[in-house]
């Protein structure tokens, strides 16, 4: 069913300098973006948080288990991941690629994937866009949030 597709995990420790908060590894990101231009198959990118989201999730003691986390921390983690996604997407645009940033909260409900949205991402990749999503803090239910990694 999902043949002829490259799902690439761009680790946070590659995209960022994990020992320095909010420090993107621009050289690595741009090198990867240039390398992606040589692929001739549909691509989906998933990137980690590194010194962006991971840094803040540790600071606010957030985990993959749903819990009532500090909502200020939820905002900070989420916005830091959007910032890193923007850096990666912009690098890909400069390399001549066609990335499309997607927040993982648009793909889940109650910590479960929305199958139709996952299929939509595959269809986007088939149409020459490159979906770029990431690990993030997502709403689960009530006042509970969870790290989706």
Task: For every predicted segment, state its role.
Residues 1-44:
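N-terminal glycine-/serine-/threonine-rich phosphate-binding loop
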Residues 59-138:
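Ligand-binding beta-strand-loop-alpha-helix segment within the catalytic cores
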Residues 23-30, 114-119, 146-149:
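Charged helix-capping and loop-helix junction motifs
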Residues 7-11, 46-47, 102-103, 132-134:
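Short beta-strand segments
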Residues 18-20, 55-59, 112, 142-145:
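Short acidic, glycine/serine/threonine-rich loops at helix termini
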Residues 33, 37, 44-51, 55, ...:
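N-terminal low-complexity or amphipathic/hydrophobic leaders
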Residues 12-13, 50, 75, 105, ...:
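Flexible, active-site-adjacent loop/turn segments at secondary-structure boundaries
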Residues 14-16, 50-54, 107-109, 138-140:
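Short, active-site-adjacent cap segments at secondary-structure transitions
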């Amino acid at each position: 069913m999902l043949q002829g597709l490259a799902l690439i995990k761009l680790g946070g420790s590659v995209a960022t300098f994990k020992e320095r908060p909010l420090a993107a590894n621009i050289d690595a990101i741009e090198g990867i973006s240039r390398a992606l231009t040589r692929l001739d198959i549909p691509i989906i990118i998933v990137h980690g948080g590194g010194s962006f989201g991971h840094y803040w999730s540790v600071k606010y003691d957030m985990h993959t288990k749903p819990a009532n986390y500090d909502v200020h921390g939820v905002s900070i983690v989420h916005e830091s991941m959007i910032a890193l996604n923007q850096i990666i997407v912009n690098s890909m645009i400069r390399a001549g690629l066609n990335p499309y940033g997607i927040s993982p909260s648009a793909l889940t409900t109650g910590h479960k994937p929305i199958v139709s949205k996952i299929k939509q991402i595959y269809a986007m990749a088939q149409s020459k866009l490159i979906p770029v999503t990431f690990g993030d803090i997502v709403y689960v239910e009530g006042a509970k949030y969870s790290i989706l990694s």
